């Protein structure tokens, strides 16, 4: 059996209660019964209960969170920790003086698991920020102190059960927006937007700290300008670096429509970063990879997005992606894409959803791996929509992410508009699988 409960209650405009919990009777349930095509790649189910409260200066959160591991190849020691409970608070006080803000972030979490190290982590970060800006530029300086303490159990003999890490975080951020009119009629606006962020975080030895919920995200333009290269409180990356970026946009003067956006970014290290996660390689380089992004929306109904990551030390590309989309109306779309990540992924992806008439629409997707020289995923489907009900049927053939075997599934969903639906949640699957997909609009009553 499968149970999926989602419920949100607002006690007042500033208080929200949330329950989001799922459970299956056995690990193979999704493969055997196909409850939603996306279920074939799920490794664990989330069980969350949360309360949030917002006031003028404070945001408060309390939650408990557990997971049901349903991937038989994933051991309990590799799965996520149970959170029993977590209490977090974020306070902000603006304009204490001209341009001066203050903040306080605090979090206490009890991490539990059947095997390995568990315990309580308390993370506190007070900070101040000052910002001065004009119409075309800004300068922002930030200073924070981050202290993290642990009370651990089931540690290795001789290990510290109450480690503590404390350090300052200093940053100086600045940017400029330069503009000029271009085009024969001066109806286009080109911008040049350089940005620089200097970040200093002293080194603290963190090899003895556990890893409860911390990871290093893939490098991107957002990551270049964060004050911590890790997500999660178990690691704070040391830094003595300068991140530089520049963006240029082409805009319509009258309506503000963006035709083109191009961005380059790179970080320059004055000292080698030394903080690492257990499986993270040693960093010995003077710069980060070079990141480039291009977004083109100049042509009616067409859009394109390009991304590229270049490793200057190895003189090779680490990541590249190209996505094209043709969308002449909200109910019709064609996508084509290419994605490459060194030693991991190289694949083509083509998808489409197109009306056959006022009530019928066809759709499909094909994903092919160039590295493995085989089709990873393909499906075709039909959708019928009227004023009162909709019917969707999808046939799919794909490589299982769990076993590597080829699986075949057929999904059927009947939706009574405004009431409920019966069968697999194929609409949610289609929204995830086809960029720009939206359900057919309701046909008029006959």
Residues of each region from the PLM?
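Outer-membrane beta-barrel proteins and related beta-barrel translocases across Gram-negative bacteria
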Residues: 1-446
């Amino acid at each position: 059996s499968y149970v999926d409960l989602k419920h949100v209650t607002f006690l007042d405009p500033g208080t929200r209660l949330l329950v989001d919990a799922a459970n299956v009777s056995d690990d193979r349930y999704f493969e055997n019964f196909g409850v939603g095509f996306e279920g074939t790649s799920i490794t664990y189910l989330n069980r969350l209960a949360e309360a949030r409260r917002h006031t003028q200066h404070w945001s408060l959160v309390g939650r408990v969170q557990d997971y049901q591991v349903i991937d038989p190849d994933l051991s309990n020691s590799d799965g996520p920790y149970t959170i029993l409970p977590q209490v977090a608070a974020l306070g902000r006080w603006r304009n204490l003086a001209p341009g001066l803000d203050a903040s306080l972030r605090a979090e206490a979490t009890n991490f539990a698991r059947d095997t390995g190290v568990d315990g309580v982590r308390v993370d506190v970060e007070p900070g101040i920020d000052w910002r001065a800006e004009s119409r075309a530029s800004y300068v922002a300086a930030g200073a924070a102190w981050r202290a993290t303490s642990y009370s651990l159990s089931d540690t290795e003999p001789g290990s510290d059960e109450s480690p503590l890490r404390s350090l300052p975080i200093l940053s100086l951020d600045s940017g400029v927006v330069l503009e000029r009119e271009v085009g024969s009629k001066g109806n286009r606006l080109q911008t040049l937007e350089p940005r620089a962020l200097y970040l200093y975080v002293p080194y603290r030895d963190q090899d003895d700290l556990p890893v409860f919920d911390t990871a290093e995200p893939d490098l991107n333009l957002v990551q270049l300008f964060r004050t911590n290269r890790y997500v999660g409180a178990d690691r704070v990356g040391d830094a003595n670096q300068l991140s530089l970026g520049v963006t240029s946009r082409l805009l319509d003067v009258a309506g503000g429509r963006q035709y083109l956006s191009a961005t380059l970014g790179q970080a320059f290290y004055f000292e080698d970063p030394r903080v690492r996660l257990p499986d993270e390689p040693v960093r010995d380089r003077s710069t980060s990879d070079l990141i480039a992004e291009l977004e083109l929306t100049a042509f009616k109904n067409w859009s394109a997005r390009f991304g590229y990551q270049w490793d200057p030390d190895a003189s090779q590309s680490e990541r590249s992606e190209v996505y094209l989309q043709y969308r002449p109306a909200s109910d019709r779309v064609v996508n084509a894409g290419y994605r490459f990540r060194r030693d991991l992924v190289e694949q083509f992806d083509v998808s489409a959803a197109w009306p056959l008439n006022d009530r019928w629409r066809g759709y499909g997707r094909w994903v092919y791996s160039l590295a493995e020289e085989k089709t990873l995923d393909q499906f075709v489907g039909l959708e019928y929509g009227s004023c009162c009900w909709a019917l969707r049927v999808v046939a799919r053939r794909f490589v299982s992410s769990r076993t590597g075997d080829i699986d075949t599934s057929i999904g059927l969903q009947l939706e009574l508009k405004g009431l409920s639906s019966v069968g697999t949640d194929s609409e949610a699957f289609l929204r995830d699988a086809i960029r720009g997909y939206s359900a057919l609009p309701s046909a008029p009553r006959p």
